[in-house]
Amino acid sequence: MTTTADPSSAQVEIASAQGVDYTLYDDVLSTYVDDSGWVNYADLQQSRQALDTFNNGLATVDDATLSSWSEEEQIAFWINAYNSLTLKSIVDQTPLKPSIKDITGVWRLRKHPINEKEKTLNNIEHDVLRVDFDEPRLHAAIVCAAISCPPLRNDAFTGENLDAQLDEQVEQWLARPDGLKIDKAAGEVKVSKIFSWFGGDWIPSYGVDSGFTGSKEEQAVLNFISQYVSDEDRAYLEAGDYQVSYFDYDWTLNNQQ
């Protein structure tokens, strides 16, 4: 059985020339997401009006308003939209699915009203965020509702705080058991599978001609990661005397236990 948003949910204007009012979305995150990024989907499913009202408001953001914002504000908008619509996709299912991958067409087929258009989650990630902005840290911020995803923040991204928030996200992501492991004794550096899937996104800003190891994509990823580790680990990564491998990806729902 699939549940949908209450059709009586109000469609509110959430945006202005100054940016987006994230009050409703902040309330959702602070209430149902813990400090480790796990989500209480069962409770959210029972009290989803704020989430639905915010998501309905995404449809009212027009191109003129969106284009008037700073790049940081635009990135924050699209990241928040991706994450809030992912939450919707999960709680639309009754009973809750064990994994987002159990929801047919969740990324490619299910369309959501946003920016006076209809977009899938794949459209937001691959046709907007990854195309319009040179910001590979977005991969630490968009959360696909799986255990191996980066942690979901329990506050909204904002244009004003985006740079610091993205750095925090990277640090928390790499600190996870399947984010980064540097094993000097074994000569192995193991990183999230996300870096394998989207390694090319790091080349424009972090590509290098020497140092590190592996393919051009892996060198760029390792250069990026080196900005977030100790000086000792940075020197080890730059030396390149190790093998790169990737953690298996756990698609189990990032549900609070």
Language model feature labels by segment:
Residues 2-79, 83-257:
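Interaction/scaffold regions that mediate signaling and macromolecular assembly across diverse proteins
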